[in-house]
Amino acid sequence: MLKTIRYYLLTTVQNPVVRQSLLTLLIRVFGVVLLFGFTLFLTQKYDPKLVGQYDFVRTFLFAIGSICLLGFDQSILYFKGRLYPNYSLGHLKKVYLKMVLMLFLASLLLFLFFVLLDASVITLFFADNTTYFLLFKASAVMFFYGLAILNVEVFRALEEIVVAELFRNVFKYLPIIVLAVLLVQWQLELYLVDALLLSFVFLGIVTTVLTFYFFTKKTAICTTDCFSAREIITQSFPIAVSGMAIFLMMSFDILFLKKYQGYAAVAFYSVAVKLMTLLSVIILTINITVSASIAASFSNKEIEKVQQIVQNSSRLIVAITLPAVIGLLIFPEFVLNFFGPNYLAAKEALVVLVLGQGFCAFFGSAPVYLNMTGRQRIFQRIVLGALGLNFILNYWLIPSYGMLGGAIAFSASAIFWNFGTALFVYYKDGIKLFLS
Protein backbone atom coordinates (compact mmCIF):
# COMPACT_ATOMS: atom_id res chain seq x y z
CA MET A 1 0.00 0.00 0.00
CA LEU A 2 2.71 2.48 1.04
CA LYS A 3 4.80 1.52 -1.99
CA THR A 4 1.84 2.17 -4.28
CA ILE A 5 1.22 5.59 -2.71
CA ARG A 6 4.93 6.40 -2.92
CA TYR A 7 4.99 5.38 -6.60
CA TYR A 8 2.03 7.59 -7.48
CA LEU A 9 3.47 10.52 -5.52
CA LEU A 10 6.82 10.22 -7.28
CA THR A 11 5.14 9.89 -10.68
CA THR A 12 3.00 12.95 -10.00
CA VAL A 13 5.90 15.09 -8.75
CA GLN A 14 8.05 14.11 -11.76
CA ASN A 15 5.34 15.40 -14.11
CA PRO A 16 6.67 18.80 -15.35
CA VAL A 17 3.19 20.36 -15.41
CA VAL A 18 2.51 19.31 -11.82
CA ARG A 19 5.95 20.50 -10.70
CA GLN A 20 5.38 23.87 -12.35
CA SER A 21 1.93 24.15 -10.74
CA LEU A 22 3.31 23.27 -7.31
CA LEU A 23 6.15 25.78 -7.66
CA THR A 24 3.69 28.46 -8.79
CA LEU A 25 1.41 27.68 -5.84
CA LEU A 26 4.38 27.79 -3.44
CA ILE A 27 5.48 31.20 -4.74
CA ARG A 28 1.93 32.56 -4.53
CA VAL A 29 1.44 31.27 -1.00
CA PHE A 30 4.74 32.89 0.01
CA GLY A 31 3.56 36.11 -1.66
CA VAL A 32 0.31 36.04 0.34
CA VAL A 33 2.25 35.44 3.57
CA LEU A 34 4.58 38.33 2.70
CA LEU A 35 1.61 40.60 1.94
CA PHE A 36 -0.06 39.77 5.24
CA GLY A 37 3.18 40.22 7.14
CA PHE A 38 3.57 43.66 5.59
CA THR A 39 -0.08 44.48 6.31
CA LEU A 40 0.49 43.57 9.97
CA PHE A 41 3.52 45.87 10.02
CA LEU A 42 1.54 48.76 8.50
CA THR A 43 -1.41 48.39 10.85
CA GLN A 44 0.88 48.21 13.90
CA LYS A 45 3.27 51.03 12.98
CA TYR A 46 1.16 53.47 10.95
CA ASP A 47 -1.92 55.52 11.77
CA PRO A 48 -5.11 54.02 10.23
CA LYS A 49 -5.65 57.23 8.25
CA LEU A 50 -2.23 56.81 6.56
CA VAL A 51 -2.92 53.13 5.90
CA GLY A 52 -6.25 54.14 4.38
CA GLN A 53 -4.52 56.63 2.07
CA TYR A 54 -2.09 53.90 1.05
CA ASP A 55 -4.92 51.45 0.23
CA PHE A 56 -6.92 54.16 -1.54
CA VAL A 57 -4.04 55.06 -3.88
CA ARG A 58 -3.22 51.38 -4.40
CA THR A 59 -6.84 50.73 -5.42
CA PHE A 60 -6.76 53.71 -7.80
CA LEU A 61 -3.63 52.33 -9.48
CA PHE A 62 -5.20 48.88 -9.86
CA ALA A 63 -8.48 50.16 -11.31
CA ILE A 64 -7.30 52.99 -13.56
CA GLY A 65 -4.08 51.15 -14.44
CA SER A 66 -6.15 48.30 -15.90
CA ILE A 67 -7.81 50.86 -18.21
CA CYS A 68 -4.51 52.48 -19.27
CA LEU A 69 -3.05 49.04 -20.02
CA LEU A 70 -5.92 48.38 -22.46
CA GLY A 71 -5.56 44.65 -21.81
CA PHE A 72 -1.97 44.45 -23.10
CA ASP A 73 -0.87 42.48 -20.02
CA GLN A 74 -3.33 39.73 -21.01
CA SER A 75 -3.12 39.93 -24.80
CA ILE A 76 0.69 39.63 -25.01
CA LEU A 77 0.23 35.87 -24.50
CA TYR A 78 -2.50 35.87 -27.15
CA PHE A 79 -0.15 37.48 -29.69
CA LYS A 80 2.56 34.98 -28.87
CA GLY A 81 0.02 32.23 -29.60
CA ARG A 82 -0.92 33.92 -32.87
CA LEU A 83 2.73 33.83 -33.94
CA TYR A 84 2.98 30.10 -33.21
CA PRO A 85 4.27 27.84 -34.85
CA ASN A 86 6.25 30.32 -36.96
CA TYR A 87 7.27 32.05 -33.74
CA SER A 88 9.70 34.95 -33.99
CA LEU A 89 11.07 36.80 -30.99
CA GLY A 90 11.53 39.85 -33.18
CA HIS A 91 7.82 39.99 -33.98
CA LEU A 92 6.92 39.72 -30.29
CA LYS A 93 9.38 42.48 -29.43
CA LYS A 94 7.75 44.79 -31.98
CA VAL A 95 4.34 44.07 -30.47
CA TYR A 96 5.75 44.80 -27.01
CA LEU A 97 7.28 48.14 -28.07
CA LYS A 98 4.00 49.25 -29.63
CA MET A 99 2.19 48.31 -26.43
CA VAL A 100 4.66 50.35 -24.36
CA LEU A 101 4.13 53.38 -26.61
CA MET A 102 0.34 53.12 -26.37
CA LEU A 103 0.56 52.64 -22.59
CA PHE A 104 2.67 55.80 -22.38
CA LEU A 105 0.13 57.78 -24.42
CA ALA A 106 -2.78 56.53 -22.30
CA SER A 107 -0.89 57.38 -19.09
CA LEU A 108 0.00 60.81 -20.47
CA LEU A 109 -3.66 61.52 -21.25
CA LEU A 110 -4.59 60.52 -17.69
CA PHE A 111 -1.92 62.82 -16.25
CA LEU A 112 -3.04 65.73 -18.45
CA PHE A 113 -6.62 65.11 -17.31
CA PHE A 114 -5.59 65.68 -13.69
CA VAL A 115 -3.43 68.67 -14.64
CA LEU A 116 -6.41 70.35 -16.33
CA LEU A 117 -9.03 69.19 -13.82
CA ASP A 118 -10.20 71.74 -11.29
CA ALA A 119 -9.04 70.41 -7.91
CA SER A 120 -12.25 71.63 -6.30
CA VAL A 121 -14.22 68.92 -8.17
CA ILE A 122 -12.32 66.12 -6.39
CA THR A 123 -12.25 68.07 -3.13
CA LEU A 124 -16.02 68.56 -3.20
CA PHE A 125 -16.75 64.90 -4.02
CA PHE A 126 -14.48 63.40 -1.35
CA ALA A 127 -14.93 66.27 1.14
CA ASP A 128 -11.21 66.79 1.84
CA ASN A 129 -8.21 68.62 0.41
CA THR A 130 -5.76 65.71 0.26
CA THR A 131 -7.44 63.33 -2.19
CA TYR A 132 -6.80 65.41 -5.32
CA PHE A 133 -3.07 65.58 -4.63
CA LEU A 134 -2.91 61.84 -3.92
CA LEU A 135 -4.64 61.06 -7.22
CA PHE A 136 -2.50 63.62 -9.06
CA LYS A 137 0.72 61.99 -7.83
CA ALA A 138 -0.62 58.52 -8.63
CA SER A 139 -1.48 59.59 -12.19
CA ALA A 140 2.08 60.91 -12.59
CA VAL A 141 3.56 57.43 -12.02
CA MET A 142 0.81 55.46 -13.78
CA PHE A 143 3.08 54.71 -16.76
CA PHE A 144 5.68 53.03 -14.53
CA TYR A 145 2.98 51.03 -12.72
CA GLY A 146 1.51 49.82 -16.03
CA LEU A 147 4.98 49.09 -17.39
CA ALA A 148 5.80 46.87 -14.42
CA ILE A 149 2.54 44.92 -14.84
CA LEU A 150 3.07 44.50 -18.60
CA ASN A 151 6.70 43.45 -18.25
CA VAL A 152 5.84 40.67 -15.80
CA GLU A 153 3.46 39.15 -18.36
CA VAL A 154 6.12 39.55 -21.07
CA PHE A 155 8.40 37.43 -18.85
CA ARG A 156 5.68 34.78 -18.98
CA ALA A 157 5.43 35.07 -22.78
CA LEU A 158 9.21 34.64 -23.00
CA GLU A 159 8.82 31.46 -20.91
CA GLU A 160 10.55 32.94 -17.87
CA ILE A 161 7.71 31.58 -15.74
CA VAL A 162 9.50 31.49 -12.38
CA VAL A 163 10.80 35.05 -12.80
CA ALA A 164 7.28 36.20 -13.72
CA GLU A 165 5.73 34.53 -10.66
CA LEU A 166 8.44 35.90 -8.35
CA PHE A 167 7.88 39.46 -9.56
CA ARG A 168 4.11 39.13 -9.54
CA ASN A 169 3.86 37.66 -6.05
CA VAL A 170 7.04 38.52 -4.12
CA PHE A 171 9.44 41.07 -5.62
CA LYS A 172 6.75 43.71 -6.22
CA TYR A 173 6.33 44.05 -2.43
CA LEU A 174 10.01 44.32 -1.52
CA PRO A 175 10.69 47.99 -2.46
CA ILE A 176 7.68 49.33 -0.52
CA ILE A 177 8.46 47.06 2.45
CA VAL A 178 12.02 48.41 2.64
CA LEU A 179 10.86 52.02 2.26
CA ALA A 180 8.05 51.62 4.82
CA VAL A 181 10.49 50.23 7.40
CA LEU A 182 12.93 53.08 6.73
CA LEU A 183 10.17 55.68 7.08
CA VAL A 184 9.34 54.32 10.54
CA GLN A 185 13.03 54.43 11.50
CA TRP A 186 13.32 58.02 10.26
CA GLN A 187 9.92 59.02 11.72
CA LEU A 188 8.67 60.07 8.28
CA GLU A 189 5.49 57.97 8.22
CA LEU A 190 3.57 60.75 6.43
CA TYR A 191 5.41 59.83 3.21
CA LEU A 192 4.00 56.29 2.99
CA VAL A 193 2.02 56.98 -0.22
CA ASP A 194 5.07 58.61 -1.82
CA ALA A 195 7.07 55.50 -0.96
CA LEU A 196 4.44 53.32 -2.64
CA LEU A 197 4.59 55.41 -5.81
CA LEU A 198 8.40 55.44 -5.86
CA SER A 199 8.43 51.65 -5.50
CA PHE A 200 6.40 51.32 -8.70
CA VAL A 201 8.78 53.67 -10.52
CA PHE A 202 11.64 51.43 -9.40
CA LEU A 203 9.80 48.24 -10.44
CA GLY A 204 8.93 49.72 -13.83
CA ILE A 205 12.59 50.50 -14.55
CA VAL A 206 13.98 47.19 -13.23
CA THR A 207 11.45 45.01 -15.08
CA THR A 208 12.07 46.95 -18.32
CA VAL A 209 15.81 46.33 -18.07
CA LEU A 210 15.12 42.63 -17.47
CA THR A 211 12.66 42.48 -20.37
CA PHE A 212 15.24 43.75 -22.85
CA TYR A 213 17.82 41.39 -21.34
CA PHE A 214 15.52 38.40 -21.91
CA PHE A 215 14.83 39.57 -25.47
CA THR A 216 18.59 39.67 -26.18
CA LYS A 217 19.15 36.15 -24.81
CA LYS A 218 17.73 34.72 -28.04
CA THR A 219 18.21 35.66 -31.66
CA ALA A 220 15.45 38.00 -32.79
CA ILE A 221 14.69 37.61 -36.49
CA CYS A 222 12.02 39.93 -37.82
CA THR A 223 11.64 41.09 -41.40
CA THR A 224 7.99 42.15 -41.36
CA ASP A 225 5.63 43.98 -39.04
CA CYS A 226 3.03 41.38 -38.04
CA PHE A 227 0.49 43.50 -36.16
CA SER A 228 -0.51 47.13 -36.50
CA ALA A 229 -1.24 49.30 -33.46
CA ARG A 230 -4.92 49.25 -34.41
CA GLU A 231 -4.99 45.45 -34.52
CA ILE A 232 -3.23 45.24 -31.16
CA ILE A 233 -5.87 47.48 -29.56
CA THR A 234 -8.72 45.69 -31.35
CA GLN A 235 -7.57 42.30 -30.06
CA SER A 236 -6.47 43.47 -26.60
CA PHE A 237 -9.36 45.60 -25.41
CA PRO A 238 -12.13 42.94 -25.61
CA ILE A 239 -9.91 40.53 -23.69
CA ALA A 240 -9.40 43.20 -21.02
CA VAL A 241 -13.03 44.21 -20.50
CA SER A 242 -13.86 41.47 -17.99
CA GLY A 243 -10.57 42.05 -16.14
CA MET A 244 -11.19 45.80 -15.95
CA ALA A 245 -14.73 45.18 -14.72
CA ILE A 246 -13.44 42.93 -11.93
CA PHE A 247 -10.85 45.54 -10.87
CA LEU A 248 -13.54 48.24 -10.83
CA MET A 249 -15.79 45.92 -8.84
CA MET A 250 -13.04 45.80 -6.21
CA SER A 251 -12.68 49.60 -6.28
CA PHE A 252 -16.17 51.10 -5.98
CA ASP A 253 -16.47 50.07 -2.33
CA ILE A 254 -13.15 51.73 -1.48
CA LEU A 255 -14.11 54.95 -3.30
CA PHE A 256 -17.50 55.21 -1.62
CA LEU A 257 -16.07 54.33 1.80
CA LYS A 258 -13.53 57.13 1.44
CA LYS A 259 -16.28 59.57 0.48
CA TYR A 260 -18.66 58.71 3.32
CA GLN A 261 -16.47 57.33 6.13
CA GLY A 262 -12.89 58.51 5.58
CA TYR A 263 -9.47 56.91 5.19
CA ALA A 264 -9.59 55.01 8.50
CA ALA A 265 -12.64 53.03 7.33
CA VAL A 266 -10.79 52.27 4.08
CA ALA A 267 -7.90 50.85 6.12
CA PHE A 268 -10.17 48.65 8.26
CA TYR A 269 -12.17 47.38 5.28
CA SER A 270 -9.04 46.71 3.20
CA VAL A 271 -7.76 44.30 5.84
CA ALA A 272 -11.02 42.33 5.58
CA VAL A 273 -10.68 42.28 1.78
CA LYS A 274 -7.08 41.04 2.01
CA LEU A 275 -8.17 38.21 4.31
CA MET A 276 -10.83 37.29 1.76
CA THR A 277 -8.15 37.17 -0.95
CA LEU A 278 -6.67 34.14 0.80
CA LEU A 279 -9.65 32.23 -0.55
CA SER A 280 -9.55 33.82 -4.01
CA VAL A 281 -5.85 32.94 -4.40
CA ILE A 282 -6.72 29.27 -3.88
CA ILE A 283 -9.54 29.44 -6.44
CA LEU A 284 -7.39 31.33 -8.97
CA THR A 285 -4.39 29.00 -8.65
CA ILE A 286 -6.44 25.84 -9.19
CA ASN A 287 -8.35 27.38 -12.09
CA ILE A 288 -5.13 28.48 -13.82
CA THR A 289 -3.88 24.90 -13.52
CA VAL A 290 -6.97 23.35 -15.15
CA SER A 291 -7.81 26.10 -17.68
CA ALA A 292 -5.63 24.66 -20.47
CA SER A 293 -7.17 21.21 -19.96
CA ILE A 294 -10.68 22.67 -20.18
CA ALA A 295 -9.80 24.48 -23.42
CA ALA A 296 -8.21 21.40 -25.01
CA SER A 297 -11.00 19.00 -24.03
CA PHE A 298 -13.75 21.39 -25.11
CA SER A 299 -12.00 21.98 -28.44
CA ASN A 300 -11.92 18.20 -28.99
CA LYS A 301 -15.64 17.99 -28.06
CA GLU A 302 -14.83 15.73 -25.11
CA ILE A 303 -17.74 17.00 -23.02
CA GLU A 304 -17.62 14.17 -20.48
CA LYS A 305 -13.96 14.88 -19.86
CA VAL A 306 -14.73 18.60 -19.42
CA GLN A 307 -17.40 17.70 -16.86
CA GLN A 308 -14.91 15.52 -15.01
CA ILE A 309 -12.26 18.28 -14.98
CA VAL A 310 -14.61 20.98 -13.66
CA GLN A 311 -16.09 18.67 -11.02
CA ASN A 312 -12.64 17.63 -9.80
CA SER A 313 -11.52 21.26 -9.66
CA SER A 314 -14.70 22.23 -7.76
CA ARG A 315 -14.12 19.47 -5.21
CA LEU A 316 -10.48 20.48 -4.77
CA ILE A 317 -11.35 24.17 -4.39
CA VAL A 318 -14.06 23.46 -1.80
CA ALA A 319 -11.86 20.97 0.08
CA ILE A 320 -9.08 23.56 0.45
CA THR A 321 -11.18 26.69 1.00
CA LEU A 322 -13.80 25.27 3.38
CA PRO A 323 -11.45 24.93 6.40
CA ALA A 324 -10.24 28.51 5.86
CA VAL A 325 -13.83 29.76 5.57
CA ILE A 326 -14.87 27.98 8.76
CA GLY A 327 -11.81 29.26 10.62
CA LEU A 328 -12.42 32.89 9.62
CA LEU A 329 -16.14 32.64 10.44
CA ILE A 330 -15.53 31.16 13.90
CA PHE A 331 -12.59 33.39 14.88
CA PRO A 332 -13.01 36.75 13.06
CA GLU A 333 -12.19 38.81 16.15
CA PHE A 334 -9.10 36.73 16.92
CA VAL A 335 -7.77 37.19 13.37
CA LEU A 336 -8.56 40.91 13.11
CA ASN A 337 -7.03 41.60 16.53
CA PHE A 338 -3.61 40.76 15.07
CA PHE A 339 -3.87 43.96 13.04
CA GLY A 340 -4.79 46.06 16.08
CA PRO A 341 -7.93 46.60 18.20
CA ASN A 342 -9.23 49.33 15.85
CA TYR A 343 -9.51 46.78 13.03
CA LEU A 344 -12.22 44.86 14.90
CA ALA A 345 -14.55 47.41 13.30
CA ALA A 346 -14.32 45.30 10.12
CA LYS A 347 -15.67 42.14 11.80
CA GLU A 348 -19.13 42.17 10.18
CA ALA A 349 -17.67 43.06 6.77
CA LEU A 350 -15.16 40.20 7.05
CA VAL A 351 -17.89 37.67 7.87
CA VAL A 352 -19.98 38.73 4.86
CA LEU A 353 -16.97 38.75 2.49
CA VAL A 354 -15.86 35.28 3.63
CA LEU A 355 -19.39 33.88 3.33
CA GLY A 356 -19.66 35.29 -0.20
CA GLN A 357 -16.30 33.93 -1.30
CA GLY A 358 -17.03 30.58 0.32
CA PHE A 359 -20.28 30.35 -1.65
CA CYS A 360 -18.44 31.24 -4.87
CA ALA A 361 -15.98 28.40 -4.20
CA PHE A 362 -18.79 25.92 -4.92
CA PHE A 363 -18.86 27.18 -8.52
CA GLY A 364 -15.28 26.01 -9.09
CA SER A 365 -14.08 26.91 -12.58
CA ALA A 366 -16.80 29.47 -13.36
CA PRO A 367 -14.24 32.34 -13.52
CA VAL A 368 -12.30 30.71 -16.40
CA TYR A 369 -14.71 28.36 -18.19
CA LEU A 370 -16.26 30.79 -20.69
CA ASN A 371 -12.91 32.36 -21.59
CA MET A 372 -11.41 28.91 -22.17
CA THR A 373 -14.31 27.81 -24.41
CA GLY A 374 -14.40 30.81 -26.75
CA ARG A 375 -17.31 32.67 -25.10
CA GLN A 376 -15.32 35.69 -23.88
CA ARG A 377 -18.03 38.13 -24.94
CA ILE A 378 -20.69 36.23 -22.99
CA PHE A 379 -18.46 36.33 -19.93
CA GLN A 380 -17.91 40.07 -20.44
CA ARG A 381 -21.65 40.71 -20.45
CA ILE A 382 -22.13 38.71 -17.25
CA VAL A 383 -19.26 40.51 -15.49
CA LEU A 384 -20.44 43.92 -16.73
CA GLY A 385 -23.88 43.09 -15.33
CA ALA A 386 -22.24 42.22 -12.01
CA LEU A 387 -20.29 45.50 -12.17
CA GLY A 388 -23.51 47.48 -12.64
CA LEU A 389 -25.08 45.65 -9.69
CA ASN A 390 -21.95 46.31 -7.62
CA PHE A 391 -22.05 50.05 -8.32
CA ILE A 392 -25.76 50.37 -7.50
CA LEU A 393 -25.46 48.39 -4.25
CA ASN A 394 -22.38 50.35 -3.13
CA TYR A 395 -24.12 53.64 -3.97
CA TRP A 396 -27.19 52.74 -1.89
CA LEU A 397 -25.70 50.69 0.96
CA ILE A 398 -22.41 52.34 1.94
CA PRO A 399 -23.88 55.72 3.03
CA SER A 400 -26.12 53.87 5.52
CA TYR A 401 -24.17 50.72 6.40
CA GLY A 402 -20.54 51.65 5.74
CA MET A 403 -18.14 48.70 5.54
CA LEU A 404 -20.95 46.17 5.90
CA GLY A 405 -22.68 47.74 2.89
CA GLY A 406 -19.49 47.46 0.83
CA ALA A 407 -19.09 43.80 1.80
CA ILE A 408 -22.71 43.02 0.88
CA ALA A 409 -22.28 44.78 -2.48
CA PHE A 410 -19.10 42.90 -3.37
CA SER A 411 -20.38 39.49 -2.24
CA ALA A 412 -23.73 39.90 -4.01
CA SER A 413 -22.07 40.90 -7.30
CA ALA A 414 -19.52 38.05 -7.05
CA ILE A 415 -22.31 35.52 -6.44
CA PHE A 416 -24.32 37.01 -9.33
CA TRP A 417 -21.33 36.66 -11.67
CA ASN A 418 -20.52 33.06 -10.65
CA PHE A 419 -24.15 31.92 -10.56
CA GLY A 420 -24.92 33.60 -13.90
CA THR A 421 -21.94 31.89 -15.53
CA ALA A 422 -22.86 28.48 -14.09
CA LEU A 423 -26.48 28.86 -15.22
CA PHE A 424 -25.47 29.82 -18.78
CA VAL A 425 -22.97 26.96 -19.05
CA TYR A 426 -25.48 24.40 -17.76
CA TYR A 427 -28.14 25.67 -20.20
CA LYS A 428 -25.80 25.77 -23.25
CA ASP A 429 -23.33 22.93 -22.64
CA GLY A 430 -25.05 20.74 -20.08
CA ILE A 431 -21.96 21.11 -17.87
CA LYS A 432 -22.41 21.46 -14.11
CA LEU A 433 -19.81 23.94 -12.86
CA PHE A 434 -21.24 23.94 -9.34
CA LEU A 435 -20.25 21.19 -6.94
CA SER A 436 -22.56 18.20 -7.12
Tell where the protein language model's regions lie, with residue ranges:
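Interhelical loop/hinge segments that connect adjacent transmembrane helices in multipass membrane
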Residues: 2-17, 186-196, 208-250, 293, ...
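Signature of the first transmembrane helix
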Residues: 15-77, 115, 237-263, 386, ...
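Membrane-water interface segments that mark the loop-to-transmembrane alpha-helix transition
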Residues: 20-31, 57, 69-119, 303-324
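Transmembrane helical elements of multi-pass membrane transporters/channels
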Residues: 20-39, 168, 172, 195-215, ...
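Interfacial segments at transmembrane-helix termini and the short loops linking adjacent helices
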Residues: 50, 118-138, 263-264, 304, ...
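Helix-loop junctions and terminal segments of transmembrane helices
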Residues: 69-85, 157, 272, 276-301, ...
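Membrane-interface junctions at transmembrane-helix termini in multi-pass inner-membrane proteins
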Residues: 144-167, 354-382, 425
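Hydrophobic alpha-helical transmembrane segments
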Residues: 167-217, 385-389, 403-427
